[in-house]
C-alpha cells in the first residue's frame, strides 16, 4: 500500500501534465493559425485591387502587388532574427499576446484603407512593413512554448506534424473568411481576420502557460516516476507544494540555462543546411500562398474563368493537401528516424507534382482539385517538418546539452532564413508572371532543386548511419 501511494501520486501528476500539454497545444495552434489567417487577405484581394484600385491597377499593377508582398515578407524575415533572440529572454506569454494584438491593428489599418479611400502606395507598403515586424514574434514564441512542453517527446515529429497543420488551417480559414466578405468590399477581408487574431491575443494573455514550471510541473521527474524510477514522490513545484511563490519564481529563474548566442546557434550541426533548404522551400510555399488565388482567377478551368470569390475558396485545396502532407512527413520521419531523408523525398516528389498541376490542372475541375491537392501535399510537407520537428531537434540537440533556451533562437534562424526566400518568391512572381506562368513554374522547380542540394549531405549521413546501425 505504501508503494501504491507514490505511484498513484505520479499517475495524477502525469494526468495533470497531459491535460496541460493538450491545452497548450490547442491554444498555440489557434494562435498561430490566426497569424496565417491574417496574412491571407492580400492574396484574396489581389485580383480586385489589380482591376480597379489605384495604385495597383494598370500595367504595373502586378509589379506593385509583388512589392506589397515583399514589403511584408522582407520585414518579417529581418525582424525574425531579432524576435528569436528576444523570445529566448522575454515572457513568452506576454510577447505572443502583444504580437497578436499588434498584428490585428496592422491588418485593420489595411482594411481601413478601403473605407477611407486611401490610394497611396507608401501607406500600403508602410502597413505591410509594420505587419511583418510585429508578426515575426509569433513563430519563435509558439515554437519555444511547445518545445518547453514537448521537448522530450519521442514522437516529436508526429506531434509537430499535426500541430504545424495550423499553417494550412490558418490559410484555409483566412481564405474562406476573406472570400466570404469580399462582396461587401475588400476592406472587410482584412477587418474580419484582424478581429479574430486580436480576440485570440486576449485569450493567450489570460490563459497560456508558457512553461511547465509555471504550472507547478516537473516533466522529467514525472516521466522518471512513471517509467519505474526510484519510487520517491514526484516533485511538484506549484499549487499544492509551494509555500512562497516569490521565492519559487527566483529559484526557477536561477535554474534556467543561459540563452544561446546568435552566431553560436548558426554553428550548431545541421542548422545552416536546413536553414538554406528552407529558404528555397518556403520560397515555393509562399509563392502559392500569395499568388495561387490570382493564378486560378486568370487561368481558365475547363474553359471557364472563376470569380474572385470562387478562386479564393478553391485555393484552400492546396492548404488541405498541405495539412496532410505535414502530418505524413512527421509520421514518416518518426518511423524511419531520418528528418533529412524525409524532407528530401517530399521535395523530390513535389517537382513532378508541380509539372502535372501546371500541365493538366486546366482540363477540368476534378483535375484541378486533385493535382492542386497533390502539389500542396508535397510542397508543404518538408516546409512543415523543417520549421517544427527539425527546428526543435536542432534547438535541443546534445551539442548544447538540451538547452531549451536555444529553441527560439534556432527556430528563428531557420524560419527567418526561410522567410527571406518567402519574400523573394512572391516578388519574382510579380515580375515573371507578366512573361507567362510557365516561367513562374520553372522558377519554382529550380528553387525546389536547390533546396534538395542542401539536404544531400545530411540525407546521405542519415542513410549511412542507419545502414551502420543494422550491422
For each predicted feature, which ranges?
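Extracellular/periplasmic helix-loop-helix junction of adjacent transmembrane segments
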Residues: 46-78, 310
